[in-house]
């Protein structure tokens, strides 16, 4: 006779693709629970952040009252409102997972900064309401806690300064896992370097820094003398508004571009497995799953010494961003240093300290199960 499995409810209040991949891993990998997944579409961000508790209660009441042993939710959820509207969930122990937080986005306008306040406050209340809070990186946890502290200081009254500490005391860091991908590699000419930039084509990933650094690199005498043939793979999801720098860069480096634009998952992994370097210029990356996947597939990362990158990228592969106006120069210098020195090349490929095996799904699924079991 098979044992009766516990029932787990998983709520994704803003069902982005990365969140889907995360909870698919949970529901496939943790077999001790019978999972029910309920989601809301990933659009109208500010409205979804404000209304999701009510939307869940009105649109999915039958599923929500089916009797659960645990509740697992992404951090967009307005947990306090949901528990008030659906009393059957009020005593179900809840784990909230933060893929990101609303305090550390590089917002472009004062209007957006004002509009994000509701989402920031809701995230504090949700974290306070949860029994357990998980973050995907130390950087994410630290920026959330420090952001909550600043937020509370700015409010007129009614918010205890002890709240961030209370949240931190019931939190832990458990990264989003990657799969153990295996891809065949191809032979190539000895003087060819394949270089990847793969992010969303949006301002917060700073594509203009990458392209400006490339132009500076190509003008450096040491690089010119090396005779290296650098092939570019510029990948990632684009949207209706694409920064102007992409079109200009595609024209300027048309003889070097080997891949341009969004790729299928299979082609994306194949390109990573056959490339040498993966570059980030991101202003914010709460974990950097794409960078971790690229490292796992054999790419050497070059990234800014900020956000989550120092947690898994050795210092010698991070470029300095202490002078923002000089960031593209710092990246160009780092690339030239790595590409043009045989000694450095051999050292960084053989003993750079890169190891992301701890991010593999088979290493992390047991930690997730232990966290859920402990609720």
Question: Which residues does each PLM region occupy?
Answer:
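Conserved donor-binding/catalytic core segment of Leloir-type glycosyltransferases
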Residues: 175-179, 186-216, 233
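Short alpha-helical donor nucleotide-sugar binding micro-motif in glycosyltransferases
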Residues: 270-275
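Nucleotide-activated donor-binding/catalytic signature segment of Leloir-type glycosyltransferases, i.e.
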Residues: 236, 243-266
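Aromatic "clamp/platform" in nucleotide-sugar-dependent glycosyltransferases that forms part
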Residues: 283
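Short hydrophobic beta-strand element within catalytic cores of glycosyltransferases
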Residues: 300-303
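A charged, aromatic-enriched C-terminal amphipathic alpha-helix characteristic of glycosyltransferases
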Residues: 47-51, 325-326, 330, 340-375
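Donor nucleotide-sugar binding/catalytic pocket of nucleotide-sugar-dependent glycosyltransferases
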Residues: 131-184
